[in-house]
């Protein structure tokens, strides 16, 4: 089962894209981490996800879910490099899971790397066609990228006039 958080973070330029937490069958730590992340309790979610990964009791199904949850928590904390590395590990374990690409795209969004974000959102759509979370995140990213380009264009015009 996948739980969806309506918004992960608020940025100065736009409402944040939605995350996709993973709830693992039969693993309390993975599920507790997902629940903490749903409530934007980043530190608690990261701690529980790390504890799950260190426990040695995860099934092969639970490992990618725990990595995904850790990725979300690290993103919420603003630790984008470590979050990106963790998302890549999750994708390596389960390369056809749309939510992993969604969450990696969110990191790119927060880093204002909108083309990379869109690439990952579109990749996620190949695994979950028509998904509402992905459509919303793509729309948000396109609008935010357009506003950023307009700002840069306006700043360039101001500099030229000076």
Predicted stretch roles:
Residues 23, 125-162:
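Terminal, low-structured helical/coil segments at or just beyond the last alpha-helical repeat
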């Amino acid at each position: 089962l996948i739980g969806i958080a309506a918004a992960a973070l608020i940025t100065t330029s736009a409402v944040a894209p939605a995350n996709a937490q993973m709830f693992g069958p039969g693993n309390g730590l993975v599920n507790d981490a997902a629940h903490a992340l749903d409530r934007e309790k980043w530190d608690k979610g990261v701690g529980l996800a790390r504890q799950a990964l260190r426990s040695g009791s995860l099934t092969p199904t639970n490992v990618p879910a725990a990595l995904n949850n850790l990725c979300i928590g690290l993103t919420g904390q603003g630790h984008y490099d470590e979050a990106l590395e963790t998302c890549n590990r999750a994708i390596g374990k389960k390369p056809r899971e749309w939510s992993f690409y969604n969450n990696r795209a969110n990191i790119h969004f927060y880093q204002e790397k909108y083309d990379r974000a869109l690439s990952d959102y579109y990749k996620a759509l190949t695994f979950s066609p028509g998904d509402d979370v992905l459509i919303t995140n793509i729309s948000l990213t396109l609008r935010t990228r357009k506003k950023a380009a307009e700002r840069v264009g306006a700043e360039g015009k101001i500099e030229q006039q000076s």
